[in-house]
């Protein structure tokens, strides 16, 4: 059975390059999702695995890293030591496990894979007085530079309604994964579901981004349970990742939905 380390390798191995678009809250307090505030033309993640249990993560053109670059080793023995990483087939990332009391930010990285494309959305909240306020969203349409044929770019939709329209009447499956340290965790067995656009449409903040990415999230984190919704419209399917927090604002589970589009 494929463990979390193997899912990580199967999902992320490659030389990923793309254009980073960042939407950052301005000094007037507004987060405008119509136009990025910062664009990094060549964000590049080279993720390699020389052996079955070790690898290297090497990134350049990074918006958040000091000097725009970072490098660190990868190892099965240390992977996911905190339980903050999650992997499904063709989707993976990492999350803050609770709304922190002292840390400077609350963040999530979500990646959706399709062939040799990787669509990444980053969500960041920062303290604003006694509240946590959405501070930045980053979107990157990565393509693997090792692929013989580069996956074509996807047009950005004009609205969330336009992006979600092809899903009307679709059915799919849902899997759940609960936080746990190490590599042994397994997602639940897939269960059938029907498409419901309301978690996106009813969110306080919703937007569409490059590569078919979409989100529906709160502007300010609630004092009790809440959900973060992120999705990606890919050729022939839509993937949705729900990040579910309980009333103590601790991460309860990740839910991955997949819908086939005729």
Where are these regions (language model features)?
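Soluble ligand-binding/transfer domains with enclosed cavities or grooves
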Residues: 2-13, 17-262
């Amino acid at each position: 059975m494929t463990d979390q380390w193997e899912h990580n390798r199967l999902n992320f191995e490659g030389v990923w390059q793309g254009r980073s678009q960042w939407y950052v809250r301005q000094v007037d307090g507004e987060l405008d999702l119509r136009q990025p505030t910062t664009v990094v033309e060549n964000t590049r993640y080279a993720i390699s695995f020389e052996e079955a249990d070790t690898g290297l993560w090497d990134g350049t053109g990074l918006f958040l890293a000091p000097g725009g670059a970072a490098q660190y080793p990868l190892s099965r023995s240390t992977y996911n030591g905190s339980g903050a990483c999650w992997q499904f087939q063709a989707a993976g990332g990492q999350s803050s496990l609770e709304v922190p009391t002292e840390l400077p930010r609350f963040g999530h990285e979500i990646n959706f894979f399709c062939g040799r494309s990787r669509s990444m959305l980053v969500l960041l909240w920062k303290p604003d007085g006694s509240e946590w306020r959405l501070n930045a969203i980053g979107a990157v349409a990565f393509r693997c530079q090792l692929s013989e044929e580069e996956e074509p770019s996807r047009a950005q939709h004009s609205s969330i309604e336009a992006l979600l329209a092809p899903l009307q009447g679709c059915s799919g499956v849902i899997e759940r994964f609960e936080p746990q340290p190490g590599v042994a965790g397994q997602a639940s067995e897939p269960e059938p579901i029907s498409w419901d656009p309301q978690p996106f449409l009813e969110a306080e903040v919703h937007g569409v981004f490059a590569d078919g990415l979409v989100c529906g999230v709160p502007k300010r984190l609630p004092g009790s349970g809440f959900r973060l919704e992120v999705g990606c419209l890919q050729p022939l399917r839509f993937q949705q990742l729900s990040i579910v927090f309980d009333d103590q604002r601790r991460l309860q589970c990740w839910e991955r939905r997949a819908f086939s589009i005729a």
